[in-house]
Amino acid sequence: MSAAWRKKITNAHRNECLQVYRSLLRSCDEIQNRPLGEKLSKIVKARTRHYQNVGNAYKAEALLKDAKKQCETLKSALNGKLPEVNIESHMLSKYRKYLNEGGKQGDVGITKPHTKTKKLKSNSIFNYVRNGEVLYHLVSTTGGDTFLRPKFWPQSQRISGMLKKRITMKENKHRLIQSMSCMLRHAKLEDEFMKAYISEEDVGYADEIHKCIQMVLSDLDSIYKRESKNWHIVSQFYNMLELEAARQKLENRYLNFWKVSRRSSP
């Protein structure tokens, strides 16, 4: 795997690159052929935006190197050492995709972001059941979440950490509901206790808390309804997996019996 994510882009590197792009823009403004200058400045602005979104340090270094090279080319053209025709043929042919002209697929346009469509992986029941063994556990948390957890993970430590976080999040939500209902009960008891000592107008502590809790609980209830539906779907799917595992075991037993009987027959 590439170690590019470990190498960080320094602020000095960013500042240097942005200075190079500013000098490029100034050079574009100095070009006498205005249509060409406008096109080049448009390319430089789009290229700057592209650089600001780059997180890969090696990619950023390559962009800076390229920007310095183009800056030298433009300066030599402005000094009369290189004709403008060469700039047009070189820079526009190389960076035409930043102008978003032609609308070809895969162009890095200014308005349209460059996105690649990933192919969907075909999902089979044999990804879940193999040789009569279900490869997943059915996990239910106290928070009301249900999901399938794979028995064998290639990166077990990292993913088990993610799973623990997910379970604790659901359990914290469950504890929140319990504590809110407890708080409401205590507020009602306090109101009943205070009725004997103060007027009824001052007794509204439980009502205020009840309004706040109802707002939170309405959101949590909608989440619970979605998750109960999810529980039903996941548990049904797990039942299907168990049936498929039993079918595979029977099939293997039958095949083994058929092989043995075939060998023993004269």
UniProtKB/Swiss-Prot annotation:
InterPro entries: Complex1_LYR_dom (IPR008011). Keywords: Cytoplasm. It is found in: Cytoplasm. One of its GO terms (biological process) is mitochondrial gene expression. The keyword Cytoplasm applies. GO terms for cellular component: cytoplasm; mitochondrion. This is Uncharacterized protein C2H8.04. It comes from Schizosaccharomyces pombe (strain 972 / ATCC 24843) (Fission yeast).
